[in-house]
Amino acid sequence: MQAPWFLALCFFVLPVAGQDDRLAFPSVEVEASLPGVGPLRRYEGLMKRWPELRAKWATEVEADQKSVVFLGDSITQGWGTSLPGRFPGMKSANRGIGGDTTRGMLVRLDDVLALNPSAIVLLMGTNDLEIGLEPSVAAENVKLILAAIKAHDAKVPVVLCQVFPSSPEKSRPKEKVQALNRLYADLVRGEEQVTLLDTWTLFAGPDGEADPKWFKDLLHLNPEGYARWAAALRPVLATLGFIETERVESPVEEGFVSLFNGKDLTGWGVRPTPPRKPSKNPPKPDAPVFVEVAEALNFDGKKTSDDGRYAAINGRLVVKTPAEGRRIQQLWTTEEFGGDFILKLEFRATPNADSGVFIRQPQLQCRDFPLAGPYQDLKNYKPQDWNELVVTVQDGKARATCNGEILEEAMAVPATGPIGLEGDRGQMEYRHIRLKKLD
């Protein structure tokens, strides 16, 4: 059911005859009647850009139907016309206005909804902090934006990017940015429609402020920063089906057998989990969810696990970002492997993602290593790109390398057992999973 504020919003911005006044930057008097909380930001550049861009976009509504729409401020506007090149094959539309706040984006949300978007990528909130608003104000407006999107289409995927780090010099201290990102995480926890992307850790330096490597002024991205943001988005957009829609075939080397056919989860399933001890303390809202399994199930012929977390998509075994923030569970091969062997696979992680590969039973951490650890000093790791993991098991010890660099020299493993893939936080993808017995 649409709330009255949403109807008022539609009346204000719907592209109909005589819309010029409605596309104008709202006067103080008009602002009082608009949805949202906190004042609109007012300065000459923004008040000039607002009507100019919105009038231009009003002429592009038909052409931009079903686009993946990027909504935000100057950082989003800074994509310019580069989106098609960043995400080949994906129809996209940029609805960023430099200087805008979360309330401004709420007011002009129909610039997005009028396109009946296939997906929406959100980055917003940094300018609210700059004008002295509390993080709770921005979070309330984002809550209203998400509610309006759901009212328009409850199935359209939303990617909510965490607010990027900045600097006290820009009136955006890390404490405020981190507080806002915590509110965003609380806001979307349990919301299947929204994927939260950790773009704060992606761009933060050791001090928690903007890493100058990625910014031209500790606020706006430089070209390397945009390349990094695009790389962070690609795995999520691929999982949603907008890019990388063709399966990448890779021959299986002589002596190896494939453990994943690339089409479905045949050969994989779940196994009973050990009973967990009940906690003496009440659970925290942001505590990880542990998935308990009572009996073994196999997913032969199925494209997804029963809960949808694990999915076979165009040759990739995807462990999706959990709506809970952290959801700890495992997918196992139905076959067990004794003796000596070599396991090879490739993996790709979203920023700060946490997963793992079980070698019979012990877990080898498989993460976005530079951000999530524990192997943070790897020279050959490729962030948000495909990396090769090779595990050689001999005489009860496992030697593991990532792109040729040693992760573990002699990890003890049992005599036999399955191969498993863990899900925790973020998205992890695996492909070309194969094994060669050495006996």
Model-inferred region functions:
Residues 1-70, 76-81, 85-86, 115, ...:
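N-terminal secretory targeting modules
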Residues 35-45, 80, 88-103, 130, ...:
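Acidic/histidine-rich helix-loop elements
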Residues 67-71, 92-96, 119-124, 157-162, ...:
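Structural recognition of the beta-strand scaffold that forms the well-ordered cores
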Residues 74-78, 98-102, 126-131, 164-168, ...:
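Solvent-exposed loop/turn segments at secondary-structure junctions
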Residues 76-93, 102-143, 148, 159, ...:
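Oxyanion-hole/transition-state-stabilizing segment in secreted/luminal serine hydrolases
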Residues 132-136, 170-174, 377-378, 413:
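Short, solvent-exposed loop/turn segments at secondary-structure boundaries
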Residues 143, 243-439:
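Carbohydrate-interacting regions of secretory-pathway proteins
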Residues 165-244:
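Catalytic His-Asp segment of secreted/periplasmic serine-dependent ester chemistry enzymes
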